[in-house]
Amino acid sequence: MLQNNEDDFSKFGDGSVPPLSRLMWRGGMPGLLDMPDQLISDFFTGYMRTYIERDVRSIAEISNLNLFSRFVRLLSALSAQEINSNELGRDLGIDRTTAVRWENICEASYQWIKIPSFNKNPIKRISSKSKGYFVDTGLLCYLQGIFSPEILVSHPLYGH
């Protein structure tokens, strides 16, 4: 049986911030737990540059990589919410088809996951929209401009 022992996480924080918040802010990518706080933002800047310039190019032909980058940031703001592709596209000046395709690219590259809605009523379960989530909480924090665990605990997305 697993036990929740806060002492197991104490080595990651200085005690001023709840340890879970620090872990959520850093995310789960390899090497980040030992990285100094001041380098986390640089890590994710490089990660996003590599993701967009190399990984996305190999998955799909996207003519405007800057617009796709804005799409990813907007998608991060919608984490834990129902996604309306029409509104998402309209906010960026792209059509619904492109918004759906780009969302699928984020899913195919393991940045984004859709979780079907749950309801005890099977009809409502089928008719309800799924919610989307960024897979890595550290990347989500970076994309939302959350640059410290202290900022995270007061952010509207905290706890969702």
Which stretches of residues belong to each language-model region?
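Active-site phosphate/ATP/adenylate-binding loop shared across adenylate-forming ligases
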Residues: M1-Q3
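Accessory nucleic acid-recognition modules appended to NTPase machines
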Residues: L33-H160
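Amphipathic alpha-helical "lid/sensor" segments that cap RecA-like P-loop NTPase cores
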Residues: N5-R49
